[in-house]
Amino acid sequence: MGRARSGPKRHVKRLAAPYAWPIPRKEGGKFAPRPYPGPHTMDTSVPLLILVRDMLGYADYAREARKIITRGEIYVDGVVRKEPKFPVGIMDVVEIPRTGDRYRVVMNEHHRLDVVPISEEEARVKVCRIKNKTYVRGGNLQITMHDGKNWLVEIEDPTDPKEDVYSVGDSLVLELPEPDSGESWKVVDHIPFEEGVWVYAMTGRHSGEVGRVVEIQTFEGPQEDLITVENPEGDQFQTTKGRLIAIGKDEPLVTVRKEE
């Protein structure tokens, strides 16, 4: 009789790791670190160790990457993260104050998680997709974002919630705190998902593409809205609403593609 498993797996086989992880499959050992359960899904995030070693190239080996992380040199969304298995995902802002480097985590056109360099000013901006909304005790509205953040909207009159102007699929623009400031993020704007807004494809066949919404097709029943997007070159593609995130009204507010 085999020995019972004592707990969750600590690692994942490289060959079985999510396709989005930009790691060698047949080199560097048999296993890769498994991210802790956290704000992102395993398919749309990587452990911080992989980001530091494989995506940023700050270390050649896992041991070196762990030292960098546990020394408190890596900040995610303005908060220091010292756990090598902390999941870092799409739209997260990564900062290394010692080097002055700043990056945004994205899904590129090859369906791989990637990082794009951003400015000091842009490092204070993050766009989050509204994933869910629920009313909680007291009649207030709780909004859950795609990265696991929760935002409480105070409702003055629960029988007439005029403050609830948000829909699942809309985006919230966050102002992120400076590293070590002790402050928290705050919501500074709302981007309704509607025709004319700029969107970025986070997943799916068109991942990494950016354009404006030109048509929204809605259906009765559980079928998801079908969105037609036109890129800056005038080419169009279609995808479902759940694969897109609105990133700006008149222009994109954040950088999601590397300069060619």
From Swiss-Prot:
Disulfide bonds: none annotated. It comes from Methanopyrus kandleri (strain AV19 / DSM 6324 / JCM 9639 / NBRC 100938). One of its GO terms (molecular function) is rRNA binding. PANTHER family: 30S/40S RIBOSOMAL PROTEIN S4, SMALL RIBOSOMAL SUBUNIT PROTEIN ES4. This is Small ribosomal subunit protein eS4. Pfam families: Ribosomal_S4e, RS4NT, S4. SUPFAM superfamilies: Alpha-L RNA-binding motif (SSF55174). Residues 46-111 form the S4 RNA-binding domain. It comes from the Archaea. Belongs to the eukaryotic ribosomal protein eS4 family. Keywords: Ribonucleoprotein, Ribosomal protein, RNA-binding, rRNA-binding. SMART domains: S4 (SM00363).
